[in-house]
Amino acid sequence: MQMAGRGANRRGQHRSPVLVRPPDAEWSMRTFGVEEELLIVDPVTGEPLALADALLAGQDEPTSGLSHELKLEQIETQTRPCHSYGELLQQIRRGRAMANQAARQHGARVAAIATSPLASNTHTTPDPRYAAMLDRFGIIATEQLTCGFHVHTSVESPEEGVVVLDHIRDKLAVLTALTANSPYWRGLPTGFDSYRTQAWNRWPTSGPSSVFGSLTAYRRIVKRLLETGVIMDEGMIYFDARISRNHPTVEVRVADVCLRAEDAALMAVLVRALVETASLEMLDGVEPTAVPTALLRMASWQASNSGLRGDLLDFGDFLPQPAADVVWALVDYLSPVLDDQGELELVKAGISDVLDRGNGAHEQRETAVRYNKRQHDGQTQPGSPPTNEALAAVVGHAAKVTVRGAAADAHKDPAPMLTRVRRP
């Protein structure tokens, strides 16, 4: 099956690839699933609440679809493997509804925001590994109350997984900009759209990785990193994208948790298209672009800083271009696969909505501005920092949007199991 590209973007720096599947290949859409980290918050003050133990009491974590994370102020949801945007969206909403139902039983709510707008002390989940991380990494672990969004996409083998990692590494910063949802940090405006990215990149292995070239090389690098003694175990391989240790998947880890469930499902569709495009490029003999890792770090920093507000570094030449142009260039690059999978129009509509509305960081800032104007009869000093009350309003708004569209009965479907994420 041949999928014709749509041609070059306006500067001709990157084209939608012309990809050819082997004519005898059996093909079906890759399954995908996601993990979302959510804040547990006070619905009045907006402050994080250390209630994860209470929310998870009596639940079988491996099968419930809810689990602990590093901090007691957060809870993680996991979807089942899915085949379509609609199926995944239903699962994401279900996970959010389950978490929120558990939180409501203790007078709390969950909010899909990637950092806490309000300052508070954090509490590490009682667990020997987490205790060792706290002792080893100090303030990095102490302050690590951040909520990310991880997308797992099925691959045929670890070898294919490494090919995917090498091909997608230069495009991941665009996802950071689209999902950026953390403009505040411990009571302060940061000037960043995704400050979670900055906080997360303090870990020793975090951020973009180099081109590996083979599974042997990937495993050699992981082995060398472990031999340094700096990190505790393979679970601390925090590359922007990695081969999952537990599932037959590639795991992409650059995104903030998305405020809206629809945006989360949309980002997962983009990731799946990246994975499929990478695999087809391999079959066509297309080599990964050897962009220096230093440039990828710069692109990640820029996406984290300005989000969709200004320029991003274009993934063709890594020069600054308007963010919307770079986002549409990514859609254009992925369009053959998206079209083949019947998702192109869905993605175009979803991306248009995000660009028109703004990412989560923009929505958080706008909520704070609206609150201040209401409290001061429309008279506010430009650039004045938001009050704690305004930040509480940000959290309250986020908590409402987080569960918008969630099913009334969050326990109807079978329990999520990401271990089943694979091609049928």
Curated annotation (Swiss-Prot):
Pfam families: GCS2. This is Putative glutamate--cysteine ligase 2-3. It is an enzyme of class 6 (ligase). Gene3D superfamilies: 3.30.590.20. Belongs to the glutamate--cysteine ligase type 2 family. YbdK subfamily. Residues 1-20, 405-424 are annotated as: Disordered. It comes from Paenarthrobacter aurescens (strain TC1). It catalyses: L-cysteine + L-glutamate + ATP = gamma-L-glutamyl-L-cysteine + ADP + phosphate + H(+).
